[in-house]
Amino acid sequence: MLVLSGSSGRIETERCRLLAREGMTALSFRWFGGVGQPPGICEIPLETFAPAIEVLRAYGARRIGVLGTSKGAEAALHLSVLLPGIDAVVAVSPTSLTWANVGPGNDGRERPYRSSWTWRGEPLPFVPYDDSWAPDPAPPEGAPVAVRGLYEHSRRTFADRLGAAAIAVENSRADLVLVAGGDDAMWPSLPQAEELAARRRAAGLPVRLIRAADAGHRPRFPGEGPAPASAHFLYGGSPAADAALGAHAWPHLLDVLRGTRGHRDGLRPRPVRRVPRQ
């Protein structure tokens, strides 16, 4: 299982340990902000993740899954479309679109906006941010900000770019679980998850959408403590609501990663590849 954090850049050690306790091989690594990497999520080659997937195969993983949160979910969804052999994706607080960069690229610049991702040397089509947006009402100086409105405003401004920037989950053969909270203050993850689910269903492909109206951007799985507060951003939800959503999603996550019980919920497990035992 490849475990990807979002724009925090955190290596998901705690989450990997939770999965290891369930008998899974789990791996997380730094994919931006390290030596020789772009300092921000700016034109990250999606090929960056392929060696980690090969490491999991070398350790005998019989199913390859990617668990991503926020921008990590954006990467996970793209990988399931572009890389062969990914069996399952769990996208937590996902987006249905490719967005512009978050932070600077290798040139040290954040502007002009560029795609967050590249594939085979070419940037993926993306939605830029409309810098005319401002929070309304304005928060007190120095207080953390909810930036969900920026994404909603940018979708309206650049409506002509949404089609090209849509993540083509209808072309992914991976089993898919989406986890999203309706009170997400970072971006509109629940409406975006609903868009992803609709694309899958229209293509006749399985999907599970696990949602809670009162949860925020950072659902917490059983065994994880509350997410720390940020001095810069509001994430929505509450410790109780975020933990409840994570607890509800956890068995679905385990099912799809193991390839078990899927037929009961409209998810048909993919055949297990013949590789060394885990």
Language-model segments: residues:
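Serine-hydrolase catalytic core
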Residues: 129-218
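Primarily recognizes the serine-hydrolase "nucleophile elbow" in alpha/beta-hydrolase
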Residues: 9-10, 14, 54-128, 149-160
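Short amphipathic alpha-helix adjacent to the substrate-entry channel of hydrolases
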Residues: 11-29
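Residues at the C-terminal ends
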Residues: 20-21, 58, 171
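C-terminal catalytic histidine-bearing segment of alpha/beta-hydrolase fold enzymes
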Residues: 191-194, 203-277
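Catalytic nucleophile-loop/oxyanion-hole region of alpha/beta-hydrolase
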Residues: 32-65
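Short beta-strand element of the alpha/beta-hydrolase
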Residues: 1-6
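Short beta-to-alpha linker loops that shape the active-site pocket of alpha/beta-hydrolase fold enzymes
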Residues: 7, 25, 30-35, 95, ...
